Every structure is written in C-alpha cells, then in structure tokens.
C-alpha cells in the first residue's frame, strides 16, 4: 500500500517486542511483486497462498497465527482478514466486515450517523466527477478536510480553510491516493482515539 513505510515500522516494532522464547516470528512481505517470507539474511521465499505456508530447505512451514502489521490496503480494508478467514488462520485485528466498514470513511460515517452519533456533513467525489465541484460543496461550512475515502495515516489529506482554488488542489492531491475523495466539514472539539479489540 501507499503506507508501506509505516507498515514496515509497525512490523519491526511488533517483532522487537515479541518474546523470542515464546514466539518464532516470520517476516512476510506483501508487495505488488508477490508475497514473500524475508529471512534475517534477506533471502526471499514465496508464500503459497493456497494455505499461507512457505517452503524453506524443502520443509513446509505453516503458521499458528498472523500478526497483521500492514497499514492501508489490503491490511486494513478486510481483504487480508477475509483471506485468513478462508484459509482458517487466526489473526490480530477485527474481522473482514468490520475492517471493510471502518476503512471506508463514507460507510463508517453512515453507520455512526445511523446509530445516532453526530457526524460531520460531507460530500463524496468519485474520480472523473470534478465538474461543478464548487457547487457540490456549496452547502458545506468551511474549513473542511479533504481526504481519500479509503486509506489511513492522513496520507493525501488536506485542511482547506476557504472556498476556491485551494479546494481543487486538495481534491487533486487526495485523488492521487484513491478513486474516491471525501470533503468533510471540520468539527471543533477534542479528538479521542480508542483502540478496541
């Protein structure tokens, strides 16, 4: 994902803090080129995606569980969780459906709003729909946040203080990260993040 640097940092931190006397860890790298176990000497061994196993020196290695450290897609959007559900491997994170809902900001906001939680007014843009963009946000109060609808770590996000050209520039920036962009009114208040598992 576009969040690879953050993912690698997370994975290193997890690996450093797991007790080696209790757990044998394997670094699995998921890239556009494939899925690989990367050994300490940087040798790469392909992952058999039929059962999420690796072959090292002719010996098949299967795993007891997966510690997901991959930010963005496919690590936070339900795709990886769904895969591990299919192969029957337990993993650390919420399930596939919950991941998919929370990764899509528009859907997560709709679910929260339906539950009676106050949410910011927003407009969703799809790639190629930038005609009349000023009109589409005319009912919003500025400042607004412009962000990729699917993604995290604030990549591609901008705060836009007033209407005009800066909004168009922020939309273009966000569209570099996703095919859907959310323009959302700013809510003044304190922000809390609570991890629930």
Where in this protein do the model-derived segments appear?
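Short acidic-hydrophobic, aromatic-tinged amphipathic segments that line or gate anion-handling sites
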Residues: 123-127, 158-163
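Short, hinge-like loop/turn segments at secondary-structure boundaries
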Residues: 42-46, 110-113, 138-140, 163
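ATP-grasp fold ATP-binding core
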Residues: 112-113, 137-157, 178-192
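Anion (oxyanion) recognition and catalysis
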Residues: 19, 85, 113, 138, ...
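ATP-binding N-terminal substructure of ATP-dependent carboxylate-amine bond-forming enzymes
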Residues: 1-97, 101-103, 107, 126-135
């Amino acid at each position: 994902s576009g969040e690879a640097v953050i993912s690698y940092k997370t994975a290193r931190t997890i690996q450093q803090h797991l007790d080696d006397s209790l757990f044998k860890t394997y670094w699995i790298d998921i890239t556009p080129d494939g899925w690989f176990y990367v050994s300490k000497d940087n040798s790469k061994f392909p992952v058999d995606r039929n059962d999420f196993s690796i072959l090292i020196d002719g010996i098949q290695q299967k795993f007891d569980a997966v510690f997901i450290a991959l930010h963005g897609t496919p690590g936070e959007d339900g795709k990886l969780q769904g895969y591990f559900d299919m192969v029957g491997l337990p993993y650390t994170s919420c399930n596939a459906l919950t991941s998919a809902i929370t990764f899509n900001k528009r859907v997560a906001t709709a679910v929260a709003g339906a539950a009676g939680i106050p949410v910011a007014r927003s407009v969703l843009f799809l790639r190629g729909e930038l005609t009349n963009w000023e009109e589409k946000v005319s009912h919003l109060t500025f400042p607004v946040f412009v962000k990729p609808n699917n993604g995290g770590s604030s990549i591609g996000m901008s705060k836009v203080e007033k209407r005009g050209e800066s909004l168009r520039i922020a939309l273009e920036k966000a569209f570099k990260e996703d095919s859907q962009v959310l323009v959302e009114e700013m809510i003044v208040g304190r922000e809390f993040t609570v991890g629930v598992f």
